[in-house]
Amino acid sequence: MTDANGFRVKLSDDRGKVVLLNFWATWCGPCKIEIPWFIEFENTYKNRGFAVLGVSMDDDGWRAVKPFLREKAVNYPVVLGDGPVARMYGGVESLPTTFLIDREGRIAAEHVGLAGKSTYEGQILGLLNSAKQADAP
C-alpha cells in the first residue's frame, strides 16, 4: 500500500516496534477526537520504538483524505484501506477500530469505538516498558 505521499508502507516495516494501527474515516466523529491524540503519541514515543499507522476507510479515497490530513497536520503514515485489508485483522465492523501491536507483531489490544486517551497511553507505555524490561540483562 502507498501513503498520501506516495511512499510504500507495510506493517512489517515496523517490526520490532509497538504499533498503534487505527482504522478510521474523515466522516467519523469519534475518529476526529482520537487523531490529535495519535499525533501526540507519535511525537512523544517515536524515539522509544513506537509508531502509528492510519488506515482510512473512506469511500472517496485520497480526494477526501489528503485535505483532512493536511488540515489536521497528521504526522504519521496513512494508507487507504478496503475490505480485504480490514479482514486481515479479523474484520473491521465499525469505526474507529484501533489495534495495539506489540514488538513481536502480536495484537496486544483492540478497541472498537472511542477509547480514552489515558487508556491508549497506558497501554502504549505498558508495551514499551515491558519490551524494555525483556531486553534488560
Question: Predicted segment positions?
Answer:
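Thiol/disulfide oxidoreductase modules built on the thioredoxin-like
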Residues: 67-75, 80-125
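Short pre-active-site segment immediately N-terminal to redox-active cysteine/selenocysteine motifs
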Residues: 17-19, 23-27, 34, 94
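Conserved hydrophobic/aromatic "anchor" residues
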Residues: 14, 23-24, 68, 76
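Structural microenvironment flanking redox-active thiols in thiol-disulfide oxidoreductases
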Residues: 32-72, 81-88
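A short beta-strand-turn-helix
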Residues: 1-19, 42-45, 89
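Non-globular targeting/processing and membrane-anchoring segments
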Residues: 131-137
